[in-house]
Amino acid sequence: MHVHKGLIFLSFFSPIYLSLLLNGSIFFFYYAQRALHDSFFFPNELLRCQICLCSLFWMVTVINLKRFFARMVNISIYQPSRNRLVRY
């Protein structure tokens, strides 16, 4: 039985991963809302790094969830279907 490596990663690092994701999301939405209301607001380098890390974490999460649900419903999106010869 094949277990996806990303799911092992997510299950092993889930407390750290989710806290980083939540922390980055809170900072991202707070500063995005602040930047919308203040046209002279520019985020500093630390905030830019945090926003980039948050978007990277979200991207990895979405990719892993897509692969996980594709395997759950047994649809091979990422691999071409192989025709196997069944012998009786």
Curated annotation (Swiss-Prot):
Keywords: Membrane, Transmembrane, Transmembrane helix. It is found in: Membrane. The chain crosses the membrane at residues 8-28, 45-65. One of its GO terms (cellular component) is membrane. Its main location: membrane. It is a multi-pass membrane protein. Partially overlaps ECM8. This is Putative uncharacterized protein YBR076C-A. It comes from Saccharomyces cerevisiae (strain ATCC 204508 / S288c) (Baker's yeast).
